[in-house]
């Protein structure tokens, strides 16, 4: 669903997670810069109310990630999330998303943030075998 304002998108994802008794969770994707900055209120509310939401913020290209004045939502929103991580290379995407879903389903409920899924990662091809889960631990 397309929203005109990021806070409204977070509120809808919050409501979806609550209506599904936290067994299913809302997912929000925003543009970088002002779009990810506007998500703060919704993330803080979800964190305070223990509502699981997967947030995928847009951001600068990975080569410009630490260049000032670029805004880093993953770093900025660590205090209002139960888990946050950046996908630095395309071959990390499967394992990062696996950890993100683990945190959404286990432990204290709350927002999980995965950044870095911009053009540098999304246009890189990955072999399908790379996405298979690892062996079970005894």
Language model regions located:
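N-terminal alpha/beta PP-like core and its mobile active-site loop of ThDP/TPP-dependent enzymes
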Residues: 1-138
């Amino acid at each position: 669903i397309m929203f005109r304002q990021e806070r409204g998108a977070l509120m809808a994802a919050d409501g979806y997670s609550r209506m599904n008794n936290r067994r299913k969770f809302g997912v929000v994707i925003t543009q970088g810069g002002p779009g990810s900055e506007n998500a703060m209120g919704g993330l803080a509310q979800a964190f305070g109310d223990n509502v699981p939401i997967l947030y995928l913020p847009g951001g600068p290209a990975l080569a410009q990630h630490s260049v000032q004045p670029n805004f880093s939502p993953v770093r900025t929103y660590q205090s209002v999330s139960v888990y946050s991580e950046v996908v630095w290379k395309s071959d990390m995407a499967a394992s990062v998303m696996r950890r993100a879903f683990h945190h959404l389903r286990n432990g204290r409920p709350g927002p999980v943030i995965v950044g870095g899924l911009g053009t540098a990662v999304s246009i890189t091809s990955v072999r399908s075998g790379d996405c298979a889960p690892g062996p079970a631990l005894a």
